[in-house]
Swiss-Prot record:
It holds the Pfam family Cyclin_N. Belongs to the cyclin family. Cyclin G subfamily. Keywords: Cell cycle, Cell division, Cyclin, Cytoplasm, Mitosis, Nucleus. The lineage of its organism: Eukaryota, Metazoa, Chordata, Craniata, Vertebrata. This is Cyclin-G2. It comes from the Eukaryota. Its main location: cytoplasm. Gene3D superfamilies: Cyclin-like. It comes from Mus musculus. The keyword Membrane does not apply. Induction: Activated in B-cells by agents causing growth inhibition or growth arrest. May play a role in growth regulation and in negative regulation of cell cycle progression. PANTHER family: CYCLINS. GO terms for biological process: cell division; regulation of cell cycle. The keyword DNA-binding does not apply. The gene is Ccng2.
């Protein structure tokens, strides 16, 4: 704290923020995935019957799709990734069990980060994720994950540091908060979370790199000076800082590329049987025959009610043409998926 100087710690709010920063710094190593396990995962060949980094990254993108679908917050996603990585780095997991583990990590994180009424039911998550396991399987796997992580699931993550750095920076400047979008920073953090290499970075360093790159983009000298003082407070070496900043910069450059499949835009994919596909074709894409609506005429009560019901059923179908009957892989956006899976 002394390194920052009295000028930058003026006021009680600044002291409280740096006190919280010190607490986070003490906690972060405790919730860091085992580096040896992460390195082993990266070195595993893709054709082997063991978990590799590509499968892990794909599962994290699935977690992002689930958080989008159920309207969960960034905290749920980041916490689910932390639980997943800590478990995978600790245990020898077969690829066939990864779907069940991913669902469990999402549910465990949602119960910690979301309001009680916003936590999706287990059966709904199973149905949407198509993980091919039962509610009993999920319950057993949740118990295994919790026990292996010693029930320490509420981790200090890079998102905690990102929010805290953002608050510290604007506590000591007259700049408007709008110039440094927290939503944009969170989206960039999600992109980094989709790559296993960033699970080896300390959360405090990853968050600092993201904020540093964004401040350099908006070219604010004042904000950059404050952030460098925060870096000094962390006792972070230039070697470590510039190493991770370069990796983050490359990741964000690729993430901004039109060829990149961004997790925010990734659609849920359902593989269904041919019979189910035919039922979906006929039920969702069919255009019902609607009765003619007379101009200026009068309806009796029953006719009016029936007509209104028919129109609501066919309203969304009019602009869509049915795909080929041979196709059994469906790409739904979240609104359509909710209509099919959770009918009113």
């Amino acid at each position: 704290m002394k390194d920052l100087g009295a000028k930058h710690l003026a006021g009680g709010e600044g002291v409280q923020l740096f006190g919280l920063l010190n607490f986070y710094l003490e906690q972060e190593q405790r919730y860091q995935p085992r580096e040896k396990g992460l390195i082993l995962m990266e070195a595993t060949p893709e054709n082997d019957n063991t978990l590799c980094s590509r499968l892990r990254n794909a599962k994290v993108e699935d977690l992002r799709s689930l958080t989008n679908f159920f309207g969960s917050g960034t905290e749920t996603f980041v916490l689910a990734v932390n639980i997943l990585d800590r478990f995978l780095a600790l245990m020898k997991v077969k690829p066939k069990h990864l779907s069940c583990i991913g669902v469990c990590c999402f549910l465990l994180a949602a119960r910690l980060a979301e309001e009680e009424g916003d936590v999706p039911p287990t059966h709904d998550v199973i149905r949407i994720s198509q993980c091919k396991c039962t509610a009993s399987d999920i319950k057993r796997m949740e118990k295994i994950i919790s026990e292996k992580l010693h029930y320490e699931l509420e981790a200090t993550t890079a998102l905690n540091f990102l929010h805290l750095y953002h608050a510290i920076v604007f506590c000591h400047t007259s700049e408007r908060k709008e110039i440094l979008s927290l939503d944009k920073l969170e989206a960039q953090l999600k992109a980094c979370n989709c790559r296993v290499v960033f699970s080896k970075a300390r959360p405090s360093v990853l968050a600092l790199c993201l904020l540093n790159l964004e401040i350099e983009t908006i070219k604010s000298v004042e904000l950059l000076e404050i952030l460098l003082l925060v870096k000094k407070h962390l006792k972070l070496s230039d070697t470590e800082f510039f190493y991770w900043r370069e990796l983050v910069s490359k990741c964000l450059a690729e993430y901004s590329s039109p060829r990149c499949c961004k997790p925010d835009l990734k659609k849920l994919v359902w593989i269904v049987s041919r019979r189910t596909a035919q039922n979906l074709h006929s039920s969702y894409y069919s255009v019902p025959e609607l009765p003619t609506i007379p101009e200026g005429g009068c309806f009796d009560g029953s006719e009016s009610e029936d007509s209104g019901e028919d129109m609501s059923c066919g309203e969304e179908s009019l602009s869509s043409s049915p795909p080929s009957d041979q196709e059994c892989t469906f790409f739904f956006d979240f609104q359509v998926a909710q209509t099919l899976c959770f009918p009113p």
